[in-house]
Each structure stands twice: as C-alpha cells, then as structure tokens.
C-alpha cells in the first residue's frame, strides 16, 4: 500500500524490535529517530554546517579582490557575490538528520520513528509531508524526494502516552501489539533463551502473566521476562521457589513500590506457577 505503519501498544511488547527485524530480514540499513519533547527540524531533518560556512566566508573575504576584479560598478559586484551566496546554501553545506538521511538512501532503508507520542504536536506537523509524499521541503534548496523505486519503509511506534493527531494517523496503516499470551511468550523465551528447561520456562511465564494482572505502576514487559530467564539460568535454577523469586524481583519490577506490593503475594503466585498444568 506504500504507506508508513504506526505501531501502538504498551511498552516492551516488541514494537521497536519489529522494525529492526524487518530491516534485518530485508538487509536494509535501519535509520532510527528517537523522539522526545522539544524535538525539532534541526535534530530530525537537517541543519546547516555553520562552521564550514564561516570558513568559506573567511576564504571569500581574503580573495574578495580577485573575485571582484573587472567588475564595473556596484551592480556587477553584487552579481558576482550573489553566485557565492547560493553556494553557501547548497547541499554541500547541509548536515542531514535521520529523516533526510532516509530520503537520500538510494538503496532504500527502514526508517524507525520511535516513541512518536513523546514528541510535540508541532513535530507531528513536520512529519506530514514526509509520511504522505516521501519528500521534504527545505526553503533554501527546494524539495528533496526519495528514490521512487526504493522509498524508505517507515515505522512509527507509540506507547499511547498521548493521543496521536488524526492527520498523522490518516497517513499511516495501524497495527496494535498487545502483551503476548502464555503460549506465545513461552515461544519467545524459548527462542531467546533456549537453555531454559521447559518446566522452568512454563513456570516463569505463568508467574509473569499473573503479575500483569496486578495493579502495578509498570507491569513486566517481554524484555523483563527474557532478563529473568537469563538470571535464573545463571543461578542454576531448576524450579521456582518463593525465596528465589523475592531475591530476583528487581529484575522484573522496576519500581520499589511495585516490589513491595508484590512481595506479599509471592508465595501465592509461586504456588500458582509451580502447580499449574
């Protein structure tokens, strides 16, 4: 459909990894723009190489006599200098940022605009031309367009911390990724940490799934499940027990208030995980 993909879902479900995996699968360069409050065109699109412009201006100043030699009157002098003014605002003096880099990739690329919900609404407006026409307009130069045969594959991710504008959503296909169910999460752990015994894998996934049902400040993401699996392997764990779980809660819970809230439930959750079929 030749459209960007907006991927939404809770933090840690693999939205960013999806874009990276597409780049790896297609053997394309992945250009990433990490969004944040206050992000503007100088960090996302382009800025001028002011140091280089200043250096060339100094060189021009030192050779001014040679340049203006033979000029008759002010009009001819201005005309000669005008040619150099245009040079200073050419692509040679342009420092491309992620969005412009993606357009200039002749072989195509994957452009990952990560956590768009952390940026301002004003930045969303800057993206609209890029998302709809795969081009960017620079006042001093003109419009720079992507190779029509190898346009960048654009992925935007959002953790839904704020509402994305309708204008941006209209330009994108939408994909929502929820937390995986137990079967899928078990497959993910098996793929990422294959040395985990099957029974331990079932227990830790069951425990994590139960944790996500609790009222926590931040529930464990898939990355925390994988980190916990690696930790349990390092501790030579064969089966979960409540004391071991308490000692390793800091691997899967990132806030002390969550650790304190869960500590009293560990025995019950561990029993549920170890006795589940």
Predicted segments with their positions:
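C-terminal regulatory/interaction module of P-loop NTP-utilizing enzymes
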Residues: 1-277
């Amino acid at each position: 459909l030749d459209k960007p993909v907006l991927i939404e879902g809770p933090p840690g479900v693999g939205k960013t990894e999806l874009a990276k995996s597409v780049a790896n699968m297609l053997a394309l360069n992945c250009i990433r723009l990490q969004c944040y409050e206050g992000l503007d065109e100088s960090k996302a699109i382009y800025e001028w190489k002011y140091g280089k412009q200043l250096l060339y201006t100094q060189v021009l100043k030192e050779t001014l006599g040679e340049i203006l030699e033979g000029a008759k009157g002010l009009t001819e002098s201005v005309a000669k200098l005008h040619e150099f003014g245009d040079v200073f605002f050419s692509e040679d003096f342009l420092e491309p940022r992620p969005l412009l880099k993606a357009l200039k990739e002749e072989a195509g690329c994957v452009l990952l605009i990560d956590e768009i919900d952390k940026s301002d609404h004003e930045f969303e407006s800057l993206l609209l031309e890029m998302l709809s026409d795969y081009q960017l307009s620079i006042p001093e130069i003109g419009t720079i367009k992507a190779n029509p045969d190898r346009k960048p594959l654009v992925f935007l991710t959002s953790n839904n911390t704020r509402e994305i504008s309708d204008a941006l959503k209209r330009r994108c296909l939408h994909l929502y990724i929820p937390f995986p169910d137990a079967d899928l999460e078990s497959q993910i752990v098996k793929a990422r940490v294959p040395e985990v015994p099957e029974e331990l894998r079932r227990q830790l996934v069951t425990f994590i799934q139960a944790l996500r049902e609790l009222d926590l400040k931040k529930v464990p993401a898939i990355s925390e499940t994988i980190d916990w699996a690696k930790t349990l392997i390092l501790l030579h764990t064969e089966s979960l027990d409540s004391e071991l779980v308490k000692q390793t809660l800091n691997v899967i819970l990132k806030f002390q208030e969550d650790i304190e809230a869960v500590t009293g439930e560990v025995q019950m959750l561990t029993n549920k995980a170890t006795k589940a079929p």
